[in-house]
Curated annotation (Swiss-Prot):
Annotated spans, Disordered: 377-402
Regulation: Activated by DAG and phorbol esters. Phorbol-ester/DAG-type domain 1 binds DAG with high affinity and appears to play the dominant role in mediating translocation to the cell membrane and trans-Golgi network. Phorbol-ester/DAG-type domain 2 binds phorbol ester with higher affinity. Autophosphorylation of Ser-742 and phosphorylation of Ser-738 by PKC relieves auto-inhibition by the PH domain. Phosphorylation on Tyr-463 by the SRC-ABL1 pathway in response to oxidative stress, is also required for activation. Activated by DAPK1 under oxidative stress.
Phosphoserine: modified positions: 205, 208, 219, 223, 345, 397, 401, 448, 473, 548, 738, 742, 910
Subunit structure and binding partners: Interacts (via N-terminus) with ADAP1/CENTA1. Interacts with MAPK13. Interacts with DAPK1 in an oxidative stress-regulated manner. Interacts with USP28; the interaction induces phosphorylation of USP28 and activated KRAS-mediated stabilization of ZNF304. Interacts with AKAP13 (via C-terminal domain).
Gene: PRKD1
Species name: Homo sapiens
Protein kinase domain residues: 583-839
GO cellular component, as recorded: autophagosome membrane; cell cortex; cell-cell junction; cytosol; Golgi apparatus; nucleus; perinuclear region of cytoplasm; plasma membrane
Descriptive protein name: Serine/threonine-protein kinase D1
Cofactor(s) for this UniProt protein: Mg(2+)
Domain PH: start-end pairs: 422-541
UniProt key word Ribonucleoprotein: no
Pfam families noted in UniProt: C1_1, PH, Pkinase
Keyword Ubl conjugation (UniProt): no
Impact when changing residue 463 to E: Constitutive activation and constitutive phosphorylation of S-738 and S-742
Length: 912
């Protein structure tokens, strides 16, 4: 008989279900199976002892080899016993079992059959060794189950199961436990309790709690028997596709074991919940669902930082352990930069603001293995991180901003943009054109933007594209002059600017009836062509928003409509918008207060436009009047800094407002910046353009009332783009000394007089400009909702913490302070803001002049400033661009020059 292997997983003598129960019974002293049966002697190899290990009713032959000193070690036997438990009965193993087991040798000749094994020399060839759990094992020992954490790359959004916050980043966002499958931040790895509940990978029983250096059995020494191979077919690394592949497959555990023992002895009390505002996407730690909203999304325990919904709070167990610290470091999830509200706060706003953030504030792409290595000592045990190197301040301090990060404030439909068009219809079809009378057969595929003629139904190669925006008309058969003699006529015609497509083939005298499948694959027949005509006609229709009322009839989109041309003030009746513009339903540019904005294209010129579609039946009369107010205001505004309204179409059910299409908005520019905020020189460039557009509005007694980065559009993707104001749904006609009281705008950017339902005037826009400057330079909102704005303004440390305001000039802070004035009479006007030293910058003036030269229109700067800046450049030794020199400017201080300058200055301040 050959010698047994060094260690082999046991082959249970009972079925699997009974074996697990037997293992649990085996770990109690005196529960052995009784006298050992006769064991056949096994021939031992040189330098080894062959014997059997018995755990419950499972018995395994093992081989004990000599160590490097030539002796036998009892530690080897303990190691074998723990390995068998980990492989065969992982649900029965626990951390530190190595120190909690006793070994007994069966001696049939003795009155006491079980003899305690005190040394490896007590084990003889062919003995049966019983593994028994010591009475020193406590209930807490069974509860301590450390996690096996590995760096993981997630392909879908995931949340930390300790703090509830989202795992940020593109790759290696966090750690995943291979035992229970839970996910954690790298920063939370040192705080999570050792409570792994999984059995995917349990190889921790052979670790000593006393620090004894144990010998781990290498994977090369393990051999599995044939019946057990199906259990071990999939390695732990194969169970998690996103796990980082490591050569040594080293795992990491959570907080120190002795701390878990201390915490288990503590008295558990009910949680103390307070309403909380979260700055990052967070899930409820009870139901694992997202805490929705922008502010006051849920409740958080003041002591242990447990997060949950308000509806889930009564169901949360009373298991709060309070604030747990070790070496001054808080082990409960940190407050980070969140804002704690009072208990009495209104929780209904979370339902009104249930839009999820569209933009992420950071992307963590770090090597977690290096971070873990820094926190390990030589023995491989986890050490507490250096508090000086913590990446997040856990308490509110003047050094770090505690304000809400800048985000897109959603008030209506969530901003979405689908990248790929959905196929509306596909199939074989034949056609010929006005330039080529040869009838061709292709596989047609219709989506929301074009008709693509593919070579076949499986490949990606195509013959031609027919953009829907280029289709001028879709009509039945009009002419048969191009039909060859004896050929069947076509079914319908697609007319574009350059060519006419004659589609389909109407078989007049079919030779024999064809089965349906051959008709579909051949692309001929009046029925097949009719289906294509209806599908294309439907694709050319204006977009019908979800939830809108839909009438009956195939020509619903050709209801009597009125087209109002803003440029020439012409009104045309019975004009269908689909004959002039093509609307792309899958290109959602955004949403305003009264409708969704889609991308579109002018059919004849190919010019890109933005089309706002409003379903009138969804809105009450008051909101419909606000829409008309927006159109009426835009009709009277013609300024390069204001978005251009081309025309408006109106049907009994819907209104289509056609505007120029721009590149993006200012908020997208801020959030996509490297630091999540803009440099000062770019902010000056953008703010100056906003102020010039506001000056034009205020000159016409128009107050925007909803000024925010989302409503500042960029004309291009250039680093220094032209900007235009849009979304005048809340705009009001307010005289110089007039006041209004109706509630308008977005709360995050509104002045306090509006929030308090007091009268407001045109200075309302100037408060919004101050907020825009603040969020552009810092990437956060300036105020918290739970504190009085006046008190926050007085607290300079709160308003301007060193991070990031230490990098920002004092002139910028001074301008913000003069704009964010609670008293309206102290708030800066447009011209006073433009004259502030922060905006009177030579480089900003040069950038604006370059923009004006590029556009071909001077509307931001004034000629009266040319001489002043040219003189400034000479005094400072700066090079003045030659192409910006104004030839009409005179360098002599003649009375005529002074009179001209005074006249120009009078024009500039005439609106004050």
């Amino acid at each position: 008989m050959s010698a047994p292997p060094v260690l082999r997983p046991p082959s249970p003598l009972l079925p699997v279900a009974a074996a697990a129960a037997a293992a649990a019974a085996a770990l109690v002293p005196g529960s052995g199976p009784g006298p050992a049966p006769f064991l056949a002697p096994v021939a031992a190899p040189v330098g080894g002892i062959s014997f059997h290990l018995q755990i419950g009713l499972s018995r395994e032959p093992v081989l004990l080899l000599q160590d490097s000193s030539g002796d036998y070690s009892l530690a080897h036997v303990r190691e074998m016993a723990c390995s068998i438990v980990d492989q065969k009965f992982p649900e029965c193993g626990f951390y530190g079992m190595y120190d909690k087991i006793l070994l007994f040798r069966h001696d049939p000749t003795s009155e006491n059959i079980l003899q305690l094994v005190k040394a490896a020399s007590d084990i003889q060839e062919g003995d049966l060794i019983e593994v028994v759990l010591s009475a020193s094992a406590t209930f807490e020992d069974f509860q301590i189950r450390p996690h096996a954490l590995f760096v993981h790359s997630y392909r879908a959004p995931a949340f930390c199961d300790h703090c509830g916050e989202m795992l940020w980043g593109l790759v290696r966002q966090g750690l995943k436990c291979e035992g229970c499958g839970l996910n954690y931040h790298k920063r939370c790895a040192f705080k999570i309790p050792n409570n792994c509940s999984g059995v995917r990978r349990r190889r921790l029983s052979n670790v000593s709690l006393t620090g004894v250096s144990t010998i781990r059995t290498s994977s090369a020494e393990l051999s599995t028997s044939a019946p057990d191979e199906p259990l071990l077919q999939k390695s732990p690394s194969e169970s998690f596709i996103g796990r980082e592949k490591r050569s040594n497959s080293q795992s990491y555990i959570g907080r120190p074991i002795h701390l878990d023992k201390i915490l288990m002895s503590k008295v558990k009390v009910p949680h103390t919940f307070v309403i909380h505002s979260y700055t990052r996407p967070t899930v409820c730690q009870y139901c694992k669902k997202l805490l929705k909203g922008l502010f006051r999304q849920g409740l958080q325990c003041k002591d242990c930082r447990f997060n949950c919904h308000k509806r889930c709070a009564p169901k949360v167990p009373n298991n709060c352990l309070g604030e747990v610290t070790i070496n001054g470091d808080l082990l409960s999830p940190g407050a980070e930069s969140d804002v704690v509200m009072e208990e009495g706060s209104d929780d209904n706003d979370s339902e009104r603001n249930s839009g999820l953030m569209d933009d992420m504030e950071e992307a963590m792409v770090q090597d977690a293995e290096m971070a873990m290595a820094e926190c390990q000592n030589d023995s491989g045990e986890m050490q507490d991180p250096d508090p000086d190197h913590e990446d997040a301040n856990r308490t509110i301090s003047p050094s770090t901003s505690n304000n809400i990060p800048l985000m897109r404030v959603v008030q209506s439909v969530k901003h979405t943009k689908r990248k790929s068009s959905t196929v509306m219809k596909e199939g074989w079809m034949v056609h010929y054109t006005s330039k080529d009378t040869l009838r061709k057969r292709h596989y047609w595929r219709l989506d929301s933007k074009c008709i693509t003629l593919f070579q076949n139904d499986t490949g990606s190669r195509y013959y031609k594209e027919i953009p829907l925006s280029e289709i001028l008309s879709l009509e039945p058969v009009k002419t048969s002059a191009l039909i060859p003699n004896g050929a069947n006529p076509h079914c319908f015609e697609i007319t574009t600017a350059n060519v006419v497509y004659y589609v389909g083939e109407n078989v007049v005298n079919p030779s024999s009836p064809s089965p349906n499948n051959s008709v579909l694959t051949s692309g001929v027949g009046a029925d097949v062509a009719r289906m294509w005509e209806i599908a294309i006609q439907h694709a050319l229709m204006p977009v019908i928003p979800k939830g809108s009322s839909v009438g009956t009839g195939t020509n619903l989109h050709r209801d009597i409509s009125v087209s109002i041309s803003v440029s020439n003030c012409q009104i045309q009746e019975n004009v269908d918008i689909s004959t002039v513009y093509q609307i792309f339903p899958d290109e959602v540019l955004g949403s305003g207060q009264f409708g969704i904005v889609y991308g579109g294209k002018h059919r004849k010129t190919g010019r890109d436009v933005a089309i706002k579609i409003i379903d009138k039946l969804r809105f009450p009369t008051k909101q419909e009047s606000q829409l008309r107010n927006e159109v009426a205001i835009l009709q009277n505004l013609h300024h390069p800094g204001v978005v251009n309204l081309e025309c408006m179409f109106e049907t009994p059910e819907r209104v289509f407002v056609v505007m120029e299409k721009l590149h993006g908005d200012m908020l997208e520019m801020i959030l996509s910046s490297e630091k999540g905020r803009l440099p000062e020189h770019i902010t000056k460039f953008l703010i100056t353009q906003i102020l010039v557009a506001l000056r034009h509005l205020h000159f016409k007694n128009i107050v925007h009332c909803d000024l925010k980065p989302e409503n500042v559009l960029l004309a291009s993707a250039d680093p220094f783009p032209q900007v235009k104001l849009c979304d005048f749904g809340f705009a009001r006609i307010i005289g110089e000394k007039s006041f209004r009281r109706s509630v308008v705008g977005t709360p995050a950017y509104l002045a306090p007089e509006v929030l308090r339902n007091k009268g407001y005037n045109r200075s309302l826009d100037m408060w919004s400009v101050g907020v825009i400057i603040y969020v552009s330079l810092s990437g956060t909102f300036p105020f918290n909702e739970d504190e009085d704005i006046h008190d926050q303004i007085q607290n300079a440390a709160f308003m301007y913490p060193p991070n990031p305001w230490k990098e920002i000039s004092h002139e910028a802070i001074d301008l913000i302070n003069n704009l964010l004035q609670v008293k309206m009479r102290k708030r800066y006007s447009v011209d006073k803001t433009l004259s502030h030293p922060w905006l009177q910058d030579y480089q900003t003036w040069l950038d604006l002049r370059e923009l004006e030269c590029k556009i071909g229109e001077r509307y931001i700067t004034h000629e009266s400033d040319d001489l002043r800046w040219e003189k400034y450049a000479g005094e400072q030794g700066l090079q003045y661009p030659t192409h910006l020199i104004n030839p009409s400017a005179s360098h002599s201080d003649t009375p005529e020059t002074e009179e001209t300058e005074m006249k120009a200055l009078g024009e500039r301040v005439s609106i004050l």
